[in-house]
Swiss-Prot record:
This is ATP synthase subunit b. PANTHER family: ATP SYNTHASE SUBUNIT B, CHLOROPLASTIC. InterPro entries: ATP_synth_b/b'su_bac/chlpt. CDD domains: ATP-synt_Fo_b (cd06503). It is a multi-pass membrane protein. F(1)F(0) ATP synthase produces ATP from ADP in the presence of a proton or sodium gradient. F-type ATPases consist of two structural domains, F(1) containing the extramembraneous catalytic core and F(0) containing the membrane proton channel, linked together by a central stalk and a peripheral stalk. During catalysis, ATP synthesis in the catalytic domain of F(1) is coupled via a rotary mechanism of the central stalk subunits to proton translocation. Component of the F(0) channel, it forms part of the peripheral stalk, linking F(1) to F(0). It is found in: Cell inner membrane. F-type ATPases have 2 components, F(1) - the catalytic core - and F(0) - the membrane proton channel. F(1) has five subunits: alpha(3), beta(3), gamma(1), delta(1), epsilon(1). F(0) has three main subunits: a(1), b(2) and c(10-14). The alpha and beta chains form an alternating ring which encloses part of the gamma chain. F(1) is attached to F(0) by a central stalk formed by the gamma and epsilon chains, while a peripheral stalk is formed by the delta and b chains. The lineage of its organism: Bacteria, Pseudomonadati, Thermodesulfobacteriota, Desulfobulbia, Desulfobulbales. GO terms for molecular function: proton-transporting ATP synthase activity, rotational mechanism. GO terms for cellular component: plasma membrane; proton-transporting ATP synthase complex.
Length: 242
């Protein structure tokens, strides 16, 4: 409670110094008497009959009497403005203000202090929350940087592996292409050899057929009737022997 009062007391003092002059100024005060007060309010100036050569002395005495009368009127006015009723009115005004301040201190200090304390706690909590978020963000940022560095390393490793794999695939493709070319060449050579053999065989067959035809023609051309009879007899003899 004392801490709450200490927190609120400066604000109350500010309010006190702010409203006290207003309370004092609100007390009714009679208007000051004008400088040129009526002649009946001032003590009569003593008129001194004197000859013409005493005019200066008479003017000085008249001015002194005027100033003295004005001073007496002002003193009387101040005494009248600070009468008992006005002092009591001022007293009750100040007392009312003091009671109001006491009520504010009694019933308003704790809520105000609680509000200020709650606000302070909320601000502190928000600051702590922001600080925690900042720490988490920095941690995540460092983790992201580490991951990014690892990703760059992984990318370099993947590129190197891809290049090496591409070289291996290139070598395999060239090897398969060379093997395919060799197989094609071998197949072509074999096909050529087969065609040559077939051609030779065909030529031999054609030549044999042609030779047989030519031999048949020659035999028929030079075969006589006796030769034909002899051939038939020989054939029948062979058939009979079988």
């Amino acid at each position: 409670m004392k801490e709450n009062i200490k927190r609120v007391l400066p604000f109350l003092l500010v309010l006190l110094f702010a409203f006290a002059p207003l309370a004092l100024a609100s007390a009714p005060v009679d208007a000051p008497a004008p400088a040129d007060a009526p002649a009946d309010a001032l003590p009569s100036a003593k008129v001194i009959s004197a000859p013409a050569d005493a005019g200066v002395i008479e003017a000085v005495e008249l001015e002194h009497a005027t100033v003295t009368g004005a001073h007496d009127v002002a003193v009387a006015h101040v005494a009248d403005s600070l009468s008992h009723e006005k002092l009591m009115d001022l007293f009750w005004r100040v007392l009312n203000f003091a009671v109001l301040m006491a009520i504010l201190i009694k019933f308003g200090a704790k809520p105000i202090a609680n509000a200020l304390s709650g606000r302070q706690q909320r601000v502190k909590s928000e600051v702590e929350d922001l600080e925690a978020r900042r720490i988490v963000a920095e941690k995540e940022f460092r983790q992201f940087e580490a991951k990014l560095a690892n990703v760059e390393k992984d990318i370099d490793s993947i590129v190197d592996k891809a290049v090496a794999q591409a070289e291996i695939e290139k070598a395999k493709i060239l090897e398969r292409a060379e093997q395919a070319a060799a197989d094609i060449q071998k197949s072509a050579e074999q096909a050529i050899q087969n065609e040559i053999a077939n051609a030779k065989r065909s030529l031999k067959n054609d030549a044999a057929d042609q030779a047989a035809v030519m031999a048949e023609e020659l035999i028929v051309k030079h075969l006589t009737a006796d030769d034909q009879v002899k051939i038939v007899e020989d054939y029948l003899a062979k058939v009979g022997a079988v």
